[in-house]
Amino acid sequence: MQLSPQEKDKLLIFTAALVAERRRARGLKLNYPEAVAYISAAILEGAREGRSVEELMSYGTTLLGKDDVMEGVPEMIHEVQIEATFPDGTKLVTVHNPIRLSVVPLVGSSQV
């Protein structure tokens, strides 16, 4: 199988994300590389499904909370950037502060 460097990178991300997903399912807290891979893979899949850049930027902040990761990890990840393939081409998706330190209720929601 002949893969381009970009395809190899995506396979590496998905492999790390699979490990992270399994560890999270067992109740283990994710470390830095696992958290980044978990978020990146979700963004790549969302792009493949046809979601917009704006949707994915927002979605990326809902995937993990501070209770899902090891101590110090939220402060280490200021942003996650991933080049994703959309139906209309490749675009860079940036998720700022992907792991929220506290949950802020959405305006107009019933969450308090």
Curated annotation (Swiss-Prot):
Record's protein name: Urease subunit gamma
So what EC number does this one have?
A: 3.5.1.5
Q: What single Pfam family name could you report for this chain, choosing any that match?
A: Urease_gamma
Q: Which reaction does it catalyse?
A: urea + 2 H2O + H(+) = hydrogencarbonate + 2 NH4(+)
The main location class comes to cytoplasm
Determine if Cytoplasm is one of this entry's keywords.
yes
For this chain, the family text in UniProt reads:
Belongs to the urease gamma subunit family.
Q: What does the annotation say about its assembly with partners?
A: Heterotrimer of UreA (gamma), UreB (beta) and UreC (alpha) subunits. Three heterotrimers associate to form the active enzyme.
Record's keyword annotation contains Hydrolase = yes
Source species: Gloeothece citriformis (strain PCC 7424)
Which GO BP terms, alphabetically?
urea catabolic process
UniProt-listed InterPro entries: Urease_gamma (IPR012010), Urease_gamma/gamma-beta_su (IPR002026), Urease_gamma_sf (IPR036463), Urease_subunit (IPR050069)
Tell me the route in metabolism or biology where this protein functions. Nitrogen metabolism; urea degradation; CO(2) and NH(3) from urea (urease route): step 1/1
Keyword vocabulary terms for this entry: Cytoplasm, Hydrolase
One cellular component (GO) term of this entry: cytoplasm
Location relative to the cell:
Cytoplasm
Q: Which GO MF terms does the UniProt record name? A: nickel cation binding; urease activity
